[in-house]
Every structure is written in structure tokens, then in C-alpha cells.
A protein has these predicted regions:
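Short, small/polar residue-rich loop motifs at catalytic or cofactor-binding pockets
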Residues: 3-8
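Conserved beta-strand and immediately adjacent loop positions that scaffold enzyme active sites
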Residues: 9-10, 21
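Short, positively biased Gly/Pro-containing turn/loop motifs at secondary-structure boundaries
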Residues: 1, 38-74
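A short, well-structured alpha-helical segment
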Residues: 18-52
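Short, acidic, Ser/Thr-enriched surface-loop or helix-capping motifs
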Residues: 13-14
Length: 74
């Protein structure tokens, strides 16, 4: 069922706000759902939606893990 879908995607936010190393860490069992989750992260990175890392950030990159689940009707 759609409610059981959950995928875990890991990636790195670079200093300029772009992303690298997008990978599915835990698959949902649905190739389409996993691909859509990766595409969402890639699109956000391309749009620099995460913003640049703060100048005071102690490093060149920030590793991040997102968990995706489908949003049902409200």
C-alpha cells in the first residue's frame, strides 16, 4: 500500500548550496517512488533550495539523510 512506502535518501550539501552524492540508502520497494525521491533532492540542489552553508560552518560539506513517505489525502 502507498502508506507503507518509505525511502531513505542520503546526500551532501556543498558550500554553495548544491548537492552531491545522492543515493538511496533504504529502498521503499517501489523503483518509481525511490527515483522520485532522488529527483526531488536533485531538483532542490539544482535550484539551490537548501541555500549555501553558513560561512562559520566548520567544513566544506554537510551530509544529510532525508526520509520520504507519500502524503495521503487530507
Amino acid at each position: 500500500s502507498a502508506r507503507a512506502l518509505r525511502t531513505e535518501v542520503a546526500f551532501t550539501i556543498l558550500k554553495d548550496g548544491s548537492v552531491a552524492g545522492i543515493e538511496v540508502v533504504v529502498k521503499s520497494g517501489s523503483y518509481g517512488f525511490d527515483a522520485a525521491a532522488m529527483a526531488a533532492i536533485e531538483a532542490a540542489g539544482n535550484a539551490k533550495a537548501f541555500g549555501p552553508l553558513p560561512r562559520t560552518f566548520p567544513g566544506d560539506a554537510l551530509p544529510v539523510t532525508f526520509f520520504f513517505t507519500p502524503k495521503g489525502p487530507q
